[in-house]
Amino acid sequence: MSPIPAKVTAIEKRGLQYQVVVEIVPKYRGSFNTIVFGEFKPHSGSLKDGRLNLVYYQNPGLNIGDPFPLWTLH
């Protein structure tokens, strides 16, 4: 596995969910399915244009600007 540099750019609580936006390196060409999450595993998410949009049902304990641990299977 190879690390992917990433950081949290936005967090918003919507009802019972937490929407988290994570910015990754723009040159990442893999799909969402090739990303491996560390301890902050989301319920669901998507990847578009170097942005991960993630949904959590519990507070992930993240703050804007925090590094976000990610790896790729490739």
Stretches found by the model and what they are:
Residues V21, P26-L62:
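Acidic, low-complexity, intrinsically disordered interaction modules
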Residues G15-V21:
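Short aromatic-glycine-enriched beta-strand elements
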Residues M1-K7:
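Short coil-to-beta-strand transition motifs
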Residues I11-K13, K27:
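Residue-level recognition of beta-strand microenvironments
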Residues T9-I11, P42-S46, W71:
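Short, exposed beta-strand/loop patches in secreted or surface proteins that constitute
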Residues G65-F68:
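Short coil-to-beta transition motif at edge beta-strands of beta-rich domains
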Residues Q58-P60, W71-H74:
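Short, charged beta-turn/beta-strand-edge "cap" motif at the junction between a beta-strand
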